[in-house]
Amino acid sequence: MRNKYIEAFENAQIAGKNIPDFRAGDTLRVATRIHEGDKTRIQNFEGICIARRGSGTGETFIIRKIGANSVGVERIFPIFSDSIEEIKVLRKGRVRRAKLFYLRELRGKAAKIRELRK
């Protein structure tokens, strides 16, 4: 049984955020707030969502992009993090899995995900 105070706090955290509906295979742009000394700036990270896990305030998602020199870069973001300014869905992907970890081994066009038709 969960503590009612913790549950009330988590519900307040969830209600305050506007999270778009996305799943594995979607291309996302995540804008994060970065603090460097006394300055603050926004950094965008754009890539394919390869997994979502957890529930409630502990829910996370993994974004993978191909960086410079064809090096794969992955970042794990907590969905309800205060440092996330915005999550924007750029494309809806058509996949048949909830976890796309197999994309780590694929290169080039083989790693492309088809776009979901409407």
Swiss-Prot record:
This protein's name: Large ribosomal subunit protein bL19
Gene3D superfamilies listed in its UniProt record: 2.30.30.790
Gene Ontology CC annotation, any one: cytosolic large ribosomal subunit
Stated role: This protein is located at the 30S-50S ribosomal subunit interface and may play a role in the structure and function of the aminoacyl-tRNA binding site.
GO biological process, one term: translation
NCBIfam families from the UniProt entry: rplS_bact (TIGR01024)
Domain of life: Bacteria
Family statement: Belongs to the bacterial ribosomal protein bL19 family.
InterPro entries: Ribosomal_bL19 (IPR001857), Ribosomal_bL19_CS (IPR018257), Ribosomal_bL19_sf (IPR038657), Translation_prot_SH3-like_sf (IPR008991)
A GO term, aspect molecular function: structural constituent of ribosome
Coiled coil: none
Keywords (A to Z) from UniProt: Ribonucleoprotein, Ribosomal protein
Keyword Ribonucleoprotein in record: yes
Pfam family, one: Ribosomal_L19
